[in-house]
Every structure is written in C-alpha cells, then in structure tokens.
C-alpha cells in the first residue's frame, strides 16, 4: 500500500511539473502595422485586423514566424508558451500565420479566447504551403537581414525552449 501511495504522489508531482501555466491575458486581434518589413515582390497575405497585408518574404527580424491552425492540437499546446515568451518583454517580434481556416471570424474568435497578443496574417488561399510545407506548427527564425536561419517543426514544449532557440539562432538574449 505504501508503494502505491508513493507511486501516486510521484505521478501527481511529475504531472504537475509538466502542466502549462494558463495564458495570463485575454487575446486580442493586433495590427500588422508594427511588423518590421522591407520591400518585397512576394505574395501578400491579409492581416487579420484588416490593416494592410504583407508578404512573408518582406519580414525582417529578429522575428519568429509561427504557422498554425485553430484545428491543430499541437498548435494549441504551444500557444501558452508563445504567450508567456511575449510576456518576457523580449526584442523579438512574433508573427502568426493562420492557415487552412474557413473564415477570418473563427480565427478572430480563437485569437481572443486563446490569449494571442501578436499580429496574425491570414492565408486564405494556402499560398504559403509551398514555403512552409504541409505540417503545422512550424516556426521560422528570421534574422535582422530577413534571412530564415532556422526552421522549427512541431510545437514548442516550453518558454525556455523558445528562449534557448532565440539565443542560439538569432543571438538575442
């Protein structure tokens, strides 16, 4: 009996350590106007808030471009980590690209109810599929010159993972 109790306590402790903290804020649809860009001839994506769209190729960093979908369970799992990372007041901009969505209204509702506070581009036509590939989530690390220096496939498991990758690939602490 004592061994079972110890095993249960250990399991609960380990489970508690792996749980993601709740997202600290209510989400909001954010303007794309503050995204750092340069002139580009790429295909323009709409901004979720209705402000002027932009081409993915025009984004300069340091930046994380996170491709996701409301229907994607791993994407939802990494959202709290991205939200907490933004809460650290870091100098790296985070930009989301919502893909394979039925309409902007459902994406806006998702953003607001899931604590997302970063600009979201909307890929209604699937034009980024050839750039980012078929699977999501995928996050591109873009340096100050606009060069993609690393592609992270799959969800972030912690805010520390994001921070370590930002230091490693973008040189930003």
Identify the residue ranges that each predicted region occupies.
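Thiol/disulfide oxidoreductase modules built on the thioredoxin-like
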Residues: 112-116, 123-173
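Structural microenvironment flanking redox-active thiols in thiol-disulfide oxidoreductases
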Residues: 76-114, 124-130
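Hydrophobic beta-strand anchors of alpha/beta hydrolase catalytic cores
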Residues: 64-65, 94, 139
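Short pre-active-site segment immediately N-terminal to redox-active cysteine/selenocysteine motifs
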Residues: 61-63, 68-71, 135
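N-terminal targeting signals for export/organelle localization
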Residues: 1-46, 161-164, 168, 172-173
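A short beta-strand-turn-helix
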Residues: 42-63
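A generic structural signal for alpha->beta connector loops
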Residues: 61, 91-92, 117-118
